[in-house]
């Protein structure tokens, strides 16, 4: 699929949708940005507010409220709509209500004649990416969930902070569910190209026992933020904009998005967070890491849990 107009439609103008829109405008990613919401006044107000800052951005951009007919010639439709996670709720607690919302949205998008790429940011993202694919009839590669992109950047940031290293020099992934069963891939985590276990032997800033605590902190990061401010949106806003950028610029970038497994990691028939090559066609290829036995077992548990939830909503 060739990117033509750099037109992106964002469905849902809550905290997440507007954070994604704001991030895309600031980075000069789009030529046209259309906001859709069940509350038309909200969409119009957000568009007007964003327009007030366009002249300070990197590129001139059209920003407006619209409707589903605007999806027809869009390159990307980003879906953020759904009920929000409340304090004490897991992301999977949201599944029944948000699955119904996702089916309704995707049906209306496809009825417009849309032939682009979906980026799904609604939670639980792995399940709703599956629902979007099943409803759309598009190839799995064209449905891209945000997956563990945010978890991975949290992981790198936390480890970098402990080691007093620039996060851009720390490489590693969180895979599996964007949620409580996510898996930190320590076996492929490196600092300046050096495996983490080798690095900490000489670094002395953290020990092996600290690694488990760190991955748990990453897993629970959203709960801490929700307890303090009721919602998370800036981090996922910037993470989603990064995925959009990779698609629009045909980057061939490796990002841990929610992608459809066809035997990779010994699993199939589910969308979940795995390192994937992302380009103008969506997910070009999944990168299959040679994870260790413990990580493989945890990943299998994560995928199994997702499959159970998918079966429950069919």
UniProtKB/Swiss-Prot annotation:
Family annotation (Pfam families): Ldh_1_C, Ldh_1_N
Catalytically driven reaction(s): (S)-lactate + NAD(+) = pyruvate + NADH + H(+)
State any GO CC term.
cytoplasm
Q: Which residues bind substrate?
A: 85, 91, 123-126, 151-154, 232
EC numbers, comma separated: 1.1.1.27
- What pathway, per the record? Fermentation; pyruvate fermentation to lactate; (S)-lactate from pyruvate: step 1/1
Residues carrying Phosphotyrosine:
223
How does this polypeptide assemble, per the annotation?
Homotetramer.
Q: Which HAMAP family match?
A: Lactate_dehydrog
- PANTHER family according to UniProt: L-2-HYDROXYCARBOXYLATE DEHYDROGENASE (NAD(P)(+)) (PTHR43128), L-LACTATE DEHYDROGENASE (PTHR43128:SF16)
**What is the designated name of this protein?**
L-lactate dehydrogenase 2
Q: Which organism is it from?
A: Lactococcus lactis subsp. lactis (strain IL1403)
This protein's gene is called ldh2
